[in-house]
Amino acid sequence: MFNDLLSELTKNILEHGGKKLIVPNEFCECVSKQGNCKLNSWLWDVPGFRRWRVTRLDAGDRLQVLNSVAYPNEQNDMPIMGIDLLWFEKKQKLVAILDFQPLVQDKEYLDRYFDGLKSLKKSFNEFNSDMKSNIYDPTKYFSPWALFCKGGNFEAENILPKIFSSFLKCYWKNLDLSKANENHIKSQEVSILHIDYDKYSAEKDPAHGLFSGFFGKEWSEKYMKEFLFPLSLENINP
């Protein structure tokens, strides 16, 4: 599960000039001591982006995960792209979130960047679930049009591939639009917001518990802070 989507994402990145960066060996591939879970990580240098990372976790029929986050350059105030897909084979359960994660929540910003995502949410009822969370504040770094699905095999096999492709196309279109339009958030403020995003995510992301269960607490904390959210280690200077 998700291998085809990973291939599609990789193809998209390459078509937009992406080049693989070296990932430290301890993060590039990690196998659990029990041998029942393997994690692979990729880091991309993509024109127009400060950082683009991808994680693929394979725990057999227990769990499959595909996660990717793309941070635009500081000179670009467009949203951060977030993809988080989980498949529980034994339970035949899909949990999927795809979102353009806004740096700010004001109307002018949302009007500039979210027409495409709004349209997708209207077109795919299966990804129109209400996203309630005891972990995240949905008004912080999630958009009101986050594509969220709690489904089964039908959604995983038939709907997810379609919406995944449309989602990526929509995000690339946003990149093109951002080049043609003037930014409303200054580069220094974008940098601060990216740091805040990483700090918030490193604290809230439930993946830490998941990784700890497979790879141990020490490795998981290092992976969270050094690979997933490295800006969480930075200080915010006003």
From Swiss-Prot:
Reaction equation(s) it catalyzes: 15,16-dihydrobiliverdin + oxidized 2[4Fe-4S]-[ferredoxin] = biliverdin IXalpha + reduced 2[4Fe-4S]-[ferredoxin] + 2 H(+)
GO biological processes: phytochromobilin biosynthetic process
Any Pfam family: Fe_bilin_red
GO MF term set: 15,16-dihydrobiliverdin:ferredoxin oxidoreductase activity; cobalt ion binding
InterPro entries named in the record: DiHydbiliverdin_OxRdtase, Ferredoxin-dep_bilin_Rdtase
Domain of life: Bacteria
Keyword Cell wall biogenesis/degradation: no
Record keywords, A-Z: Oxidoreductase
Gene3D superfamilies: 3.40.1500.20
EC primary class: oxidoreductase
E.C. number(s) listed in UniProt: 1.3.7.2
NCBIfam families given in the database record: PRK13247.1
Purpose of the protein: Catalyzes the two-electron reduction of biliverdin IX-alpha at the C15 methine bridge.
Family of the protein in this entry: Belongs to the HY2 family.
Name this protein carries in UniProt: 15,16-dihydrobiliverdin:ferredoxin oxidoreductase
Species the sequence originates in: Prochlorococcus marinus (strain NATL2A)
Organism ancestry: Bacteria, Bacillati, Cyanobacteriota, Cyanophyceae, Synechococcales
